[in-house]
A protein has these predicted regions:
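Residues at helix-coil transition
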Residues: 51-55, 96, 138
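Terminal low-complexity segments of carbohydrate-biosynthetic enzymes
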Residues: 72, 98, 127-146
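Residue-level signal for the nucleotide or nucleotide-sugar donor/cofactor binding architecture
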Residues: 82-85, 120
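Post-His helix in hydrolase/transferase enzymes
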Residues: 120-128
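Conserved glycosyltransferase catalytic-site signature
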Residues: 61, 65-66, 84-91
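Catalytic donor-sugar/metal-binding loop of nucleotide-sugar-dependent glycosyltransferases
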Residues: 56-57, 78-82, 91-109
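A general structural signal for well-ordered alpha-helical segments in protein cores
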Residues: 42-47, 87-91, 101, 129-130
Length: 146
């Protein structure tokens, strides 16, 4: 089970799926936080790109929140990755093994304190996206070959 920001019951830093979030409310929530509106927008776009590359219905491939029975996971699924791209690998391994992967909504609140490691700059966002894209293309090839 994946915690997803992009399905019913989930939300993302000012944008709540179960409410009628106005653009004004979203911008206000982000302005009163330590989050970048650009990072939020790019995250949504990036998840859609990953979804397209992988031809999957999973909507939040950068969530990082996953729960399941221990027997379905191995340490190799989490080792040897640069940042959060392990999550794409884990989800695709589970799907390749014909396991039922479901998403449940969770709300990622706007950051009130501290700085994001991910969105400190546009360059960093772009640099961190490369390993995700690499593992997505590799996973797609593995799924097509099986």
């Amino acid at each position: 089970m994946i915690g997803s920001r992009f399905i019913e019951g989930g939300g993302y830093k000012g944008l709540e799926k179960n409410t009628k979030s106005t653009l004004k409310n979203i911008i206000n929530n982000l302005n009163n936080s330590e989050d970048s509106a650009l990072a939020v927008y790019l995250s949504i776009l990036f998840n859609n790109l990953l979804k397209f590359i992988l031809s999957t219905n999973i909507r939040d491939l950068t969530s990082g929140f996953i729960v399941g029975k221990k027997r379905f996971f191995s340490s190799e699924m989490f080792n040897g990755f640069e940042y959060g791209e392990y999550f794409v690998f884990v989800v695709m391994k589970l799907l390749k093994n014909n396991l039922n992967v479901r998403e449940v909504g969770y709300y990622c609140k706007p950051r009130k304190f501290g700085k994001s490691k991910t969105s400190s700059s546009l360059f960093r966002l772009i640099r961190l996206s490369y390993p995700y894209l690499k593992i997505a293309y590799k996973s797609r090839k593995e799924l097509n070959d099986s």
